[in-house]
Amino acid sequence: MFSVNIRKTDSTHEINIADEGQGMSQVLPIVTRCCMSDDKDTLIVVEQPELHLHPAAHEAIADLLADTAKVNNHRYVIETHSKNLLLEIRSIVANKNYSLTKDDVVVYYIHDDEECNAILDRIDIDENGNMSDWPEEIFNESFELIKKIRRNAN
């Protein structure tokens, strides 16, 4: 029998992952896969990496995905319902200190038409983190993250 213990970077206290929330045990395989290096470009599909995690952790996941995309030769397809994850990706694109650029990111908004057919609308992110043609009814954006996008764009 075995157990998996985790600890925060700034702590010596270890916690059994079974004693953490469900989100931690669900995100651990994603984090592990993201940190694995590949010789060739690898496509990794991730469904709702933010599931069962605190909203602040959504930003950390976005940072991890951005950091590992080029370093580990990964391309990601991410399905998410997290406005924080998307806002952080926008912030990263606007941040000139990151290697992730507007050309590296594509967003698709999927919705149904009148006949219940799935429609994919491409939404581009510009170099300042702004999104083209975003539906007004989706995601009431957090004021603090919008300020961060503006700061990083300058």
Report the location of each language-model feature:
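Switch/communication elements of ASCE P-loop NTPase nucleotide-binding domains
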Residues: 1-151
